[in-house]
Amino acid sequence: FGESENVNVKFVAATYDEKGNKLDTPGVEYVKWNGTYPISPLKFMGDNSGKYVSYLWDPNEYINVMMYNFADGGDSDEGTVLGISHMPYTIVGSTALEGLETTKAKNIQKRQLKYPHCVSINSLYANKNGNGGYYESDRYANSNHEATYISPFDVVVTLSHELGHYLGLFHAFSEHKVENADGTTTTDASEGCYDTDYCDDTPSYNRTEYMVYIEYYMKSHTTPRLQDVLLRTPCDGDNYLSANIMDYSYTLGYKISAQQKARIRNVMYYSPLIPGPKKNGANTRAAGYEAEGKLDLKPVIIK
């Protein structure tokens, strides 16, 4: 598509499970669910009772990606949500990352969690669609990797987007945090136009206004043009075509900016509950501060 920052992070499907057993399919474990199905992702990921932590592999060694059918949330849009992720934590101190919930605990073990720290993907959109194809853009099969068709349900973009959240990135449009009655913290698009992702090199825009434009455009055009649906009007500056991985559809969904890369690298190097080598000794018993018992963390869930 175009230029993007190389984050130098490689995701590898596990070949063995947490207990050392070889997996039949790398990266895949099938687990029986005894609760109501389909599953509400907000209720599952926001549950603070500890009953769902057993579904996790050690978050300090693995990124847990749960795939299941999302329940229709009634008045909410859960059933049509493509994916949801927990945001990471940042440790209090000189390397703390703006916008993330802080913690003093450098070494957080799975046994200390009350909730299932993970990414959730709506498996409805990982299956074949009504036409027999998959929910994805045609760029993956095209020899030149150029897209002539953009799927708003592209599961590849969805997973990349949610992993961006998991590694510290917010949306590339104006949003705000919402403290919900059930004790969970989520985010929602803002009515105004502000830069809220803590990255100055990603133009922000009013998502609510864009959705009004798209609804009108789709009703008045039988054959939508890709350039038209990608068009964004930023809070300041010139119009542009959406390409950032942290935007919502319609977007090319491939670009990571320099400041987004810096946030990801900060989380990789300094945050607990994130796999990989650390510069501050996080995730080790020599980290200096290890709480005992269950921790009262404040998870943020973001779509």
Q: What is the predicted role of each segment?
A:
Residues 243, 247-303:
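Pan-zinc metallopeptidase signature
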Residues 20-22, 73-77, 130, 253-256, ...:
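Short, solvent-exposed loop/turn elements at domain surfaces
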Residues 42-172:
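Active-site-proximal segment of zinc-dependent metalloprotease catalytic domains
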Residues 9, 63-67, 120-121, 158-159, ...:
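Long, contiguous hydrophobic alpha-helical segments, chiefly transmembrane helices and signal peptides
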Residues 5, 59, 113-115, 237-240:
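A short, structural micro-pattern
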Residues 127, 135-255:
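The catalytic-center signature of Zn2+-dependent metalloproteases
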Residues 20, 36, 50, 94, ...:
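Intrinsic-disorder/low-complexity loop/linker signature
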Residues 1-63, 67-72, 269-272, 281-299:
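Propeptide-to-catalytic entry region of secreted or membrane-anchored zinc metalloproteases
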